[in-house]
């Protein structure tokens, strides 16, 4: 065993005890009669202090020969002292060089020499050695844990749906085609139809966390062609408000979990994550258009709110409501997919919503149309053929309860939570319009 403790696990209780630490060389300093070595692991930095009179001569000679990012393991005695930068040091008895790093490095993991995003993504393994990048992905891990725990605490069952499908989930054309033996198939852009089918099964409350694939040619700071979606569906709801209420509590739980468990990472990022206030404001589509009109942005009724409109609304909600998170709801039916339920007394309006975070849509959802005949008509209204959806419609003929749900973009949630400039910062190996490797 090369390691008994991570840097974060070395506490005063270990003072005077022997430990093993391992990681990458961060810095070496030679002061003649004393040499210093700092090594980095995933939790931080450890200082190795080697006074000439107290360490093996061969070990003393080895330290200045180490290069940045060499992989080493150190065995030694913990010494807590105010003289050490970090409050403690390790007096080495043994240093093993596990591997050498070539020079020059593809980028500087200390961050002193800046690198373009493309260079960083091409060398993601090295990029992650930067503490601020490591912090982002530790937070990402916490978000996924918090979300999964919250679903289970609220009686949801995890499901896994196909990612190779025969027909477009929402009738869109933004699908990646593929050959499935002798047939044409596509990569799934959403588990929408399958999670609705599950509402007829009696599972009642389901969720899935899985990749989705969208052949959108957008090359922006908020789009990916492969992303992770947090999807949910719940049966026996009376209206879309029940779904919105659950979603806001889920998002608030994830944010608060990060606040509680990732204080160190937030400090590394120099970011203060505010506690979300429940309930999130609800802004109707009509009210949103009115606000935008007052801001000089005119959107014809029935059209979706574009990127600039979202940005302006986000700024307005922060300045006037101090609300980074808010819902847009009561959308025109023509702007939303066929499976969204319309208001019976006002069919031009539907029971759909979007959740916005700092002016970017992170989730869409709503109450679904559970009545078979009406659903068939809505499919036709969108210019689609109901026969293509027979596998889906079949579930609606044998007792489908009222239901609703949402899809929440994991990367968008994390990007907006940390107020990062680019969605590629929060996914290890982005797939976008130009990037297929690494």
Swiss-Prot record:
Binding-site residues, L-aspartate: 170, 214, 364, 368
Thermal characteristics: Optimum temperature is 60 degrees Celsius.
Reactions mediated catalytically: tRNA(Asp) + L-aspartate + ATP = L-aspartyl-tRNA(Asp) + AMP + diphosphate
Annotated Gene Ontology cellular component terms: aminoacyl-tRNA synthetase multienzyme complex; cytosol
Entry's Gene Ontology molecular function annotations: aspartate-tRNA ligase activity; ATP binding; magnesium ion binding; RNA binding
Residues noted as binding Mg(2+) 3 in the record, renumbered to the chain: 361
Function: Catalyzes the attachment of L-aspartate to tRNA(Asp) in a two-step reaction: L-aspartate is first activated by ATP to form Asp-AMP and then transferred to the acceptor end of tRNA(Asp). Is specific for tRNA(Asp) since it aspartylates tRNA(Asn) 3 orders of magnitude less efficiently than tRNA(Asp).
Assembly information from the UniProt record: Homodimer.
This protein's name: Aspartate--tRNA(Asp) ligase
Organism this protein belongs to: Thermococcus kodakarensis (strain ATCC BAA-918 / JCM 12380 / KOD1)
């Amino acid at each position: 065993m090369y390691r008994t403790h991570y840097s974060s696990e070395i506490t005063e209780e270990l003072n005077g005890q022997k430990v093993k630490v391992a990681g990458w060389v961060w810095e070496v300093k030679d002061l003649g009669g004393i040499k210093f070595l700092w090594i980095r692991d995933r939790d931080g930095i450890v200082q190795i202090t080697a006074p000439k009179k107290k360490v093996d001569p061969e070990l003393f000679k080895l330290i200045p020969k180490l290069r940045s990012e060499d992989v080493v393991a150190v065995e030694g005695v913990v010494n807590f002292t105010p003289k050490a930068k970090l409050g403690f040091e390790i007096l080495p008895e043994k240093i093993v060089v596990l591997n050498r790093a070539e020079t020059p490095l593809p980028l500087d993991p200390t961050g002193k020499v800046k690198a373009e995003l493309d260079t960083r993504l091409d060398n993601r393994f090295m990029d992650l050695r930067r503490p601020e990048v490591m912090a982002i992905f530790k937070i990402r891990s916490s978000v996924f844990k918090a979300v999964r725990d919250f679903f289970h605490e609220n009686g949801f069952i995890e499901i896994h749906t196909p990612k190779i499908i025969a027909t477009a989930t929402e009738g869109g054309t933004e699908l990646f085609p593929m050959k499935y033996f002798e047939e044409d198939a596509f990569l799934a852009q959403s588990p929408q139809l399958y999670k609705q089918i599950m509402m007829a099964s009696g599972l009642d409350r389901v969720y899935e966390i899985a990749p989705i694939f969208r052949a959108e040619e957008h090359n922006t700071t908020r789009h990916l062609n492969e992303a992770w979606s947090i999807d949910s569906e719940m049966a026996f709801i009376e209206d879309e408000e029940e779904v919105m209420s659950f979603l806001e509590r889920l998002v608030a739980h994830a944010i608060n979990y990060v606040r509680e468990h990732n204080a160190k990472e937030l400090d590394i990022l120099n970011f203060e994550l505010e506690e979300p206030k429940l309930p999130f404001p609800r802004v109707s589509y009509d009210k949103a258009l009115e606000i935008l009109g007052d801001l000089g942005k005119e959107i014809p009724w029935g059209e979706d709110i574009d990127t600039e409109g979202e940005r302006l609304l986000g700024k307005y909600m922060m300045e006037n409501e101090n609300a980074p998170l808010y819902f847009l709801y009561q959308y025109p039916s023509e702007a939303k997919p066929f499976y969204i339920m319309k208001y019976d007394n006002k069919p031009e309006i539907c029971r759909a919503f979007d959740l916005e975070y700092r002016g970017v849509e992170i989730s869409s959802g709503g109450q679904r149309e559970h009545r078979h005949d009406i659903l068939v008509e809505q499919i036709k209204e969108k210019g689609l053929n109901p026969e293509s959806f027979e596998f889906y419609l079949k579930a609606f003929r044998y007792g489908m309860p009222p239901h609703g749900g949402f899809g929440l973009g994991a990367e968008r949630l994390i990007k907006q939570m940390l107020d990062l400039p680019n969605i590629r910062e929060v996914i290890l190996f982005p797939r976008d319009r130009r990037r297929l490797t690494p």
